[in-house]
Each structure stands twice: as C-alpha cells, then as structure tokens.
Amino acid sequence: MSIQDLRDVKIITAMITPFKEDGSINFEVLPELIEHLLSHHTEGILLAGTTAESPTLTHEEELELFGAVQKIVNGRVPLIAGIGTNDTRDSIEFAKEVAAFGGFAAGLAIVPYYNKPSQEGMYQHFKAIADASDLPIIIYNIPGRVVVEMTPETMLRLAEHPNIIGVKECTSLANMAYLIEHKPEDFLIYTGEDGDAFHAMNLGADGVISVASHTNGDEMYEMFTAIEQQDIRTAAAIQRKFIPKVNALFSYPSPAPVKAVLNYLGFEVGPLRLPLVPCPEEDAKRIIKVVVDGDYEATKATVTGVVRPDY
C-alpha cells in the first residue's frame, strides 16, 4: 500500500482493541466488528492508536493484531499502524518492523509525550523516523494528551519531507485552516476530533480519524456527502444531532464510552486495560441512550454536563 490508497479516504476508524475478561486480546470478535465498520462507511482503519489502548499493548501484541486484521480486511480498505512513542529510537525500530511486516498505507506517530520536546526536538524526532524506513508517516498532533503542541510552522517544515504524508490534527480550527492554506498539495490533513469534522471538511480537510464511526458511521457519511454536494443546510442539521453523541462518547476517558456502546450492541469488545476503567453503570446507560437512541433527556444531560469533549 502507499499514500495513493489514502487519497480519497474520508472516514478512518481508530479501532478499539477488544479484550477478554482476563485482559488478553479477543481475536474472535474481530471479524464481526470489522464487518460492522465496513458496512457503516469506514473507508480506512487505524490500528494501535489511542482508542486501541496502545500504551498498554506490547509491540508483539500489536504485530499479532496487525496480522489478524489484515487477513480479515483482505485489502478492502487501507490500514494505518500506530508506530510512535516518546522514544525516537523505539519509534524508528518499530517503524522499520511495520514496514517489513507490510500491508500498511502509513504509520501514525504521535508527538512525543512526557519528554516535552522543543519545536526543534519534535522536528528532529519525526525527521529521524521518516528517514529510517520507507513507511509513510502521518503525524499525530494532540496536545490534550501530549502536553506540548507542534506549531503549524513546524508541521509545514515536516510536510516538506517526502516520507511524511499527513497529519491527524487535534488542535484548533484556526491551526487547521492555516495548514490547509499553506501545505504542500499532496499533504493529507485529517481532523482527529469527531465534533470538528463538519467544520474541518468545510475548511478543506481530507477527512477524519474517528472514534464515533464505530457507532455513528452512517450519520458521518451522510454529513460528508451533503458537504460534497454543497448542501450545507442538510449537513448542519446532521451535525446538530451528531454533536451530543460525540460529547457522550468522550464524556468519560476514551475508549470506555465507545466500548460501553459496542458491548451493548452485542459485539463483546470487553473491558479496558488498567489504568483505564469502564464507565460507571449509570453513565454508561446515559451514553447508550444518547449515542444509540438519540434520547432527548439523556442528550440534554450530556450537553449541559460536557462543555467540550475530552479527546
């Protein structure tokens, strides 16, 4: 696979990792889950990202997961592998390993967390990863989890690297607009914030790397279709109903809410690995009512209780 596989991909699902009660990966659930995603307009899948609980997955588990998903997907949609850590050497070695493994359109590498690197440190980190293998790299800029934020200027420097093909941007819409205006033509820009997908697509973003597409992919697809058809009134009407669902899906540390909904829908994706824990039962019930049923009272509680989702 290559960057060309991602050219017209607008909805990429950052897929959860299903676990058994003993904490091991539940590979038996994967076929049903993946077919559900593909039948509801997922056009690409990110594995071993934040939503997959990658901090608590070993590289060996990730590679086993990659192989299992590749067999199920069988080339129907492009795959992206989470490969980044806050250790440049480890990120380089895993990027090489994933490149040798094959079958991925790109690797997603997060801005280094905890270390708090400078802009030059971020630049050198990603340049080193991109120089080290032929796996195309997408930068993951999410200061809410990382603490530091890559500036648009640093991003545009890295966008000139031939092996850095895009960004999953979770900063401001102002930053996204600036990047879209000034980026190289082939540089892909995805929002990583479901609630901002409407605005990002209207600004000219390439798509979304989504959690909500696990449960509300049809709505997202309909909204994007309306935007493409320049029917902003319809797209905005969908967005108004979509926002409370996104808020609900991020009203407790992710991916606990989306796992609660998927378990309710019968997918048996199981628990989370510590230090993450499931939503409290009453919260889970409210989240399910909002996301699945669009329940008015539960939606009102979500809107008044969450000013902005915590991605």
Curated annotation (Swiss-Prot):
The keyword Lyase applies. It is found in: Cytoplasm. The record marks T50, Y114 as: Part of a proton relay during catalysis. Keywords: Amino-acid biosynthesis, Cytoplasm, Diaminopimelate biosynthesis, Lyase, Lysine biosynthesis, Schiff base. It is an enzyme of class 4 (lyase). The keyword Cytoplasm applies. Its EC number is 4.3.3.7. GO terms for biological process: diaminopimelate biosynthetic process; lysine biosynthetic process via diaminopimelate. GO terms for cellular component: cytosol. The active site is at Y140, K168. Pathway: Amino-acid biosynthesis; L-lysine biosynthesis via DAP pathway; (S)-tetrahydrodipicolinate from L-aspartate: step 3/4. Pyruvate binds at T51, I209. Its main location: cytoplasm. It catalyses: L-aspartate 4-semialdehyde + pyruvate = (2S,4S)-4-hydroxy-2,3,4,5-tetrahydrodipicolinate + H2O + H(+). GO terms for molecular function: 4-hydroxy-tetrahydrodipicolinate synthase activity. Homotetramer; dimer of dimers. Catalyzes the condensation of (S)-aspartate-beta-semialdehyde [(S)-ASA] and pyruvate to 4-hydroxy-tetrahydrodipicolinate (HTPA). Belongs to the DapA family. HAMAP family: DapA. This is 4-hydroxy-tetrahydrodipicolinate synthase. The gene is dapA.
